[in-house]
Each structure stands twice: as structure tokens, then as C-alpha cells.
Amino acid sequence: TLMHRDIVCLQIPSFEIVLARTHEASLRHRPVALAPVHTPRGLVREVSQEALDDGVLPGMSVELARQLCPGLRVIPPDSSRTQAAHRELQQAIMPFAPVWESIQPGSLFLDLTGTQRLFGRPIDTAARLERELTVKWGWHSQIGVAMNKLVSHLAATTLEKPPQMRSIYSGSEQAFLAP
């Protein structure tokens, strides 16, 4: 028999923009894009919800992004701040998940298999973790809970806006993945 697994995918969308807004209040509630600033052909890496609403997408040229959204603020990546914040995120999840794996800054897989007696249902553990991140740093996350990484990742990344959670119960993966 297959062992039941509980895999959580936790993502803080536009993590670097979230961090920049924490440090610079003028970036809040306005369209922001993360891109290398000193290159004419720079591509947008992350966008705020406000920029997304104006049609700006990751992978787009900065030039096109500025045409679509004249009020766009383009900020450069800050890898040291991002890495430091990701380490803080890792520290924060340790009490909740004995086994975890980093995907990219602001994104983690947590293996909550076998932790139900200690922490309760995985979706409840994920909800407590989400609350802690919001209270401690103001980070809103998208969370997917499923039996494997692929389904939990899709469950998290296909949510509209954080904070949101989606749990795909064992046996319902096929229905969730169907087009």
C-alpha cells in the first residue's frame, strides 16, 4: 500500500517586491516591477498585483512594461536582502515542519507526513504558519496541500491572490488536474 503523504507548498508571491515594500513605504499600493535596471533589454522578473492589473507580466521587456503602465516603478533585485529574508522564512517554518525543501526565495515545500498527532491536520498547520508569517512580517502566502509536490505546487500557484489555501484530498488529484 502507498503511504499517505502530506506535502505543503508555501509560496509568498512576488517575494522580492514584498520585501522592498517592507523597507520602502512609497512602493506600497502602486505598480512595481522587479528587473535589472542598468540594461536596456532587461526583463521583468516579478510584478506587484497593481502592475499585473495594468497588464504587466513577468518575462516582459521593461520597455513594454513601461508603455503598458506609465506609473510603473522598476526596482532592481536585492539578492542579499532576499537571501536573508528567505533564511528567516526557513527558521519560521522549522517548528511546523521537520522535513522541508527550498524551491526558491519565498517558496518552500514542507513534508507534514506523520505530524498529525503533534500538530493536527496539515491544512490547519499550514493555516497557523500562514498567520504567523502575516503577523510577524506581513507576508501573505499561497498554500497548496496535497499528496505530492507537483499537485501541492499547482494547488498553490493557481490561486488568485494571497492569502489563500487549497487542499487537494487524496483521490481527487485527477479531477483537480483535469483541464
Give the ranges of each region predicted by the language model.
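Residues that scaffold, gate, or flank divalent-cation-dependent active/transport sites
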Residues: 2-109, 114-116, 122-134, 142-145, ...
